[in-house]
Design a protein with these regions (language model features):
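Metal-cofactor-dependent catalytic cores
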Residues: 1-147
């Protein structure tokens, strides 16, 4: 699995901006993103494969940035169990919780988007180690200890 897209926004409800790379800071999140400095919601991550399934269910395609997630990987399932780890280059992320789709997605993508994205909206992670994340980077997934 590889990073297919990176999106950040300067503030809540402001447009998401696609970038080729971003700096992740341990304990604080992605530089330049609205959640930088938040306690646990440092990074959100989703799978394009699951977005494609949601688009098929909706009957129309949409850009991965429309979901307002930070990272989109090209394929596979995103771990949702708290404690699961993802490693992208030097950056280590820990899953905190499932990223629930917001009802506002129905406004941005279209009616039924939030329902189509249920169980496909990815995960919320905290940043454990700092480094750069680039489009094309490999993503390694590790299950939580004891699983």
């Amino acid at each position: 699995m590889k990073v297919a897209a990176i999106h950040i926004a300067l503030g809540r409800r402001l447009p998401m901006r696609a970038v080729e790379d971003v700096v992740a800071e341990a304990g604080t999140g992605l530089l330049g993103d609205r959640y930088h400095g938040s306690r646990h919601r440092h990074v959100t991550i989703q799978s394009q494969e699951l977005l494609d399934r949601a688009a098929a269910e909706l009957g129309r395609g949409f850009d991965c940035g429309a979901t307002r997630r930070n990272l989109t990987v090209d394929r596979g399932e995103i771990p949702t169990q708290p404690g699961a780890r993802l490693v992208i280059g030097d950056v280590e992320l820990e899953v905190v919780r499932v990223a629930a789709p917001c009802r506002l997605l129905d406004d941005g993508i279209g009616p039924g988007a939030a329902a189509a994205l249920r169980r496909r909206a990815g995960s919320v992670c905290r940043v454990l180690s700092s480094g750069a994340i680039r489009v094309g980077d490999t993503v390694e997934v590790f299950s939580p200890a004891g699983c």
